[in-house]
Amino acid sequence: MAAEMELKRIPSPPRIVAISGIVFSGLFIASLVLIRLAAPADPKDPGIWLSDPALRNWVLMSLNLVPFTGIAFLWFMAVLRNHIGLLEDRFFATVFLGSGLLFVAMLFAAVAVTRGLMDAFASADSILVQPETYQLGRSMAFALMNTFCMKMAAVFMFVTSTIGLRTAVLSHWLSFVGFSFGLVLLLVIADFAWIALLFPLWVLLVSAFILYSGFNKDSTNPVSHRVG
């Protein structure tokens, strides 16, 4: 029976799908770095960066990467569920799916608000006409990204690490790294914007572990891969 369950847990999708987490990490890191370098992290900034064409282009490039980032993350979630296989628990699976989908939703909402601000205020001078509108949109985008989005990322890390410990589908050290990173995101993300990079770095580690364990399983038991 144990051998049969092991066979069913072997990933059935193409192996290339497992790199979706690596793709997400690369895109999300690039997007975060671009927007952090171009726009101030302070939600009360006066919007001087809007008058610089180069900085505006950096922000637009960052925003254009986000849709692909979200798509890659959805595939990463599917890879994780496939890796868990029959060991998936309904209780934790509900939190896993909910936090992951809310993370993507909050990410897209933050980008939509930011893009709306850039379209409404083509330069720093236009902010002088309606400064309250700019500050409202800027604060909303900051809250969506740095409060709600990252808190959902922290919950996703907690529940994935918990599943990893309970089912042994992830190594113990990787689960503890997830708990540590999630706690940091949950407590101090609003004060240190660069800490948001912890989430894509953790996803990168998990993706590398899944790829390594998959290839290692194939090399030690090539027949099981053909059966799956």
Segments predicted by a language model, with ranges:
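Hydrophobic, aromatic-enriched alpha-helical segments typical of multi-pass transmembrane helices
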Residues: A2-G228
